Amino acid sequence: MSTVPLNEIGQEFVRNKIGLVGIGILATLFIISAMAALTIPLETLKTWNNPESWLEFPKTALPAWINLFLSEKIPEHKILTNSEDSLQSTEELTIFSQQFSVVYEFDDFPNDFIYEFTAKYSGSPLLQISVIRPDGMTVELLSRSLPYLESAVHHERVFSTDNAVKKNLILQSEKFGFLLNDISAEQIVFSESSVQKVLNGKYVFLIRLVGTSSENEIVKSSLILGGKVFGFVGTDELRRDLSVGLLWGTPLALFIGIAVAIGSVVMGLLYGVYAGFIGKKTDETMMRFNDVIYALPALPFLIILAVTISNSIFVMVGFLMIFGWVGVAKVSRSMALQIKTRQYVEASKIMGQRSSKIILKHILPQLLPYAFASVAISVPAAITTEAGLSFLGLGDPSFPTWGQILHDASTHGAAARGLWWWVIPPGLMIAVTGLAFVFIGNALDTIVNPRLKR
């Protein structure tokens, strides 16, 4: 391992195509990390494992771009928030009305539909939901009283799977030319009247809040048509948007990999250089301790520590540092043994300079090229180790790391069920991130080690 000046390393690196490819991939990953930090709220991390926070998304939906390659279009997930509101009042009744319009142009039925609302009212008003279909038929979906309140706010979700919705539809079976008992509410609503076939066109959902108080109103509402494709990466079994997990997983992976690599390389560098420079019994004792740590099986110990102490991502980073410095220490010691025999180091000793000053001024600067290469090469190992622990269920569940996504996919049998969009993207991100640092590390290693040059 030669000691190449840093300016020469830079000049050589820009001529290395593999190294530049690695830099390009790494720059892209940093841009993705910045996008995640700027566009996705931090609260998403706290709600990642809360099913209530993802109810408005579809379950195990394919990526939306899949429709570009299909002749029969799969229904897209739609969240409608813009409604036409109106208020009608008489001496006895107040009717607050909402109207959601949607053009449905797909070749399959939606998964479900959900009406979510927050209403402010007093008493026990009547909630009525109906839909005007493209063929002009009006279908009543729901008609029931809301819980009695005295001027308070009420939040509720009405699902197409509710028994009350299905019963109302069965009562209108004379409008359809096929049996309704064994099919879902969304299939009835979005089907032609004569045959069970998708009816495309404009659907208008009407919501009415009928009561005696003039203050009755729907403060906030949305209509969700549960599609089978959603977003760029799709969703998982818990309805979570996988693109959020992949985006947040990028800065987390870079933090884990870079923090562990820098920490372990710095520890190993200082430890090995000090042992090699001091020598004698100090060197012997330190190297025997190094051998003990080196002989420990890292993965079983990491599993035991994660189970018994903590599975926090920060504790895991510390554990990975503890087991990652020993190899660097051995190499840096051997390099320090060579450098300390040079004349300028001997001259510094004769002049009475302190050992710490000699190490910092004459030895460590010459090991920096090796340190940079070691950092780059160590990052993939840290990322894959964290992913492996998370895949085994020993990771930090509060953070959506790529390993945690793969663990959830394994738990729900994603591979066996053919949910490829839940398995391939996180695995691909782990591979690409590791590849970027391998390219950079190999390029640096080729520059600082002439024996590797072709």
Predicted regions and their residues:
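Alpha-helical transmembrane segments of integral membrane proteins
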Residues: 235-454
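Gly/Trp-centered helix-boundary motif
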Residues: 1-257, 409-427, 431-432, 445-454
